[in-house]
Amino acid sequence: MKNIGLLLKKERKRKGMTQQQLANLIPGLTRSSISKYESSENIPHYNMDKFIEVLKSPRLKLAVNGTVIKSPLLDNVDLSPLATQQKMLEELKETMDSLKKLNLINKLNTQDLDENEREFILQDVLIQICDLDTCSSLFMASIIENFNFDIAEIEKQEINKMKRKGYLSRGRY
């Protein structure tokens, strides 16, 4: 995992924590081990899971797991290319409709939201995006399996595209 230590440091600082404060929240870790992890790429997965949990960091989770929310492999749906394409179009429309209703003008953090806005974001926007994420993963799996595309090649092309556009500055993360 390239630059994961740097991301860990950024996320710890974003939460306003010192290395010692973070170490105090994770049994078995010390300030010096946190320092070592932040300057390295070798962080054991079990510790990474603890960092994600304690820091409640969607960025770390995305960097480590490739997703913020895990998408289940649904086993009671039609996974044919046409069925998944149609479901994808339906989920895209529902997500677009939810996003169009979302007003984020002058909304930068949780203090800027009232309870109704928080509930709307959770129930109507984030849950809908989870549905779309699951659907898009199943659609991709269906297309890749049925039409014999190479997953590694798709990932490589996507990473290269993100680098060309300037969205990735160094390495993968």
Give the residues covered by each predicted segment:
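A short, Lys/Arg-rich alpha-helix, primarily the initiator
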Residues: M1-K13
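Residues that mark the N-terminal boundary/hinge immediately upstream of a DNA-recognition element
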Residues: L7, T18-Q19, P44-N47
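Short alpha-helical DNA-recognition segment
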Residues: G16-S33
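DNA major-groove recognition helix of helix-turn-helix
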Residues: I26, Y37-E38, L55
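DNA major-groove recognition helix of helix-turn-helix/homeodomain DNA-binding modules
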Residues: Y46-L62
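Short, charged recognition helix plus adjacent turn
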Residues: V64-K87, I154-Y173
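Helix-turn-helix/homeodomain-like alpha-helical modules used for DNA recognition
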Residues: V68-T134, A141
